[in-house]
């Protein structure tokens, strides 16, 4: 069969989509670049907040409305797990939903390994009629054989299994764990991802070797709680540091390893030292902090000790003076007073983060935060978001301007010409994670997927400009 996978949401979903791609290609199916002409279309869904769920439904509805005769449509992943009944109700032309815990069975679903009673010809229960006995899946998984293995090791757990990598482009995400042991008041993820499970070091190294052999220049480590890696494997407090040492023996010194989603309270002195010492490690950390006022943080069920957070940030900057630090904050959280918001603005000014993702609080049914009193009005959220972004824009502009006169190592991701016909490349420096950060533009020629040196002579709020040297 020909299949096409559409991935919505975070990089962790990208990794799971690669896993499904690997399973299907190993079983003889063929990937195609468009839903047109595909026998099976798989959408790896997102359920992070309501806006993400609405986007998921919209994508599925459009695909359903344009289904070719005989074409099958599968919703996989987070929203299939958390709101499978909603998907089946709003997208009745869905042929199956496959939860986060079952994506390894995608081969059996596509092959139609289910008994024929009350099924379509595709081998899955019809979506109409009475509600399914398994509300998060439209497939009777008891009738579908469990995945028994993959190219890198025995299948043990849906979150910890190594996957065959489908290399697309010079960068690749590598998920080292899934699930989360934290219970932040605003977050639904543990309710459908479960507690954290770390992938075995050997499995991670196997994936990394495959990516290196495929020519990937940048490996981006992702997890729900990156810095807690290995705790469930008995690695205590420095599991991530131990893993990085092992990865450094696999990834050449001239390539990049990037860390995303590092929880601040789990950053140890040993980890800081390891990051500063290993040449592969980008001096970059994405460290979601969410707020800066102790009272707000307590309501969020986050560590309220902002002094400790400052000490951790300072230790990272002392070890790596060129560190690029990204974080995220939520404004308009229930009960956020003007004084609490002012504390956040002061924190931005004091800490001088390179990049900030600012989010307006989104009420999620079923969360502790959703039941809190003093929900903040939408107009107040919008005003505070604009105010905070204005403060951070000035900071980001100044942080970026420091690089004028420097020569940056840039991973080239595209080439073209400007309005005058001059050759130009676009890529990212160590300061820039894919999609969420800035870009580097350089006049001259270079190969896509390789590193180039660009002498910086101009900056904007978030981007760098220069000449290839």
Swiss-Prot record:
SUPFAM superfamilies membership: Radical SAM enzymes
Catalytic activity: L-aspartate(89)-[ribosomal protein uS12]-hydrogen + (sulfur carrier)-SH + AH2 + 2 S-adenosyl-L-methionine = 3-methylsulfanyl-L-aspartate(89)-[ribosomal protein uS12]-hydrogen + (sulfur carrier)-H + 5'-deoxyadenosine + L-methionine + A + S-adenosyl-L-homocysteine + 2 H(+)
Disulfide bonds: none
Domain called Radical SAM core: residue spans: 166-398
Pfam family, one: Radical_SAM
Binding residues annotated for [4Fe-4S] cluster 1, in chain numbering: 10, 46, 78
Domain MTTase N-terminal: 1-115
SMART domains recorded: Elp3 (SM00729)
Residues annotated for [4Fe-4S] cluster 2 binding in this entry: 180, 184, 187
Enzyme Commission code(s) on record: 2.8.4.4
Domain TRAM: 401-469
Gene Ontology CC terms, in alphabetical order: cytosol
GO MF assignments: 4 iron, 4 sulfur cluster binding; aspartic acid methylthiotransferase activity; metal ion binding; protein methylthiotransferase activity
Main location: cytoplasm
Enzyme class label: transferase
UniProt similarity note: Belongs to the methylthiotransferase family. RimO subfamily.
Free-text function comment from the UniProt entry: Catalyzes the methylthiolation of an aspartic acid residue of ribosomal protein uS12.
Protein name, per record: Ribosomal protein uS12 methylthiotransferase RimO
The gene coding this protein: rimO
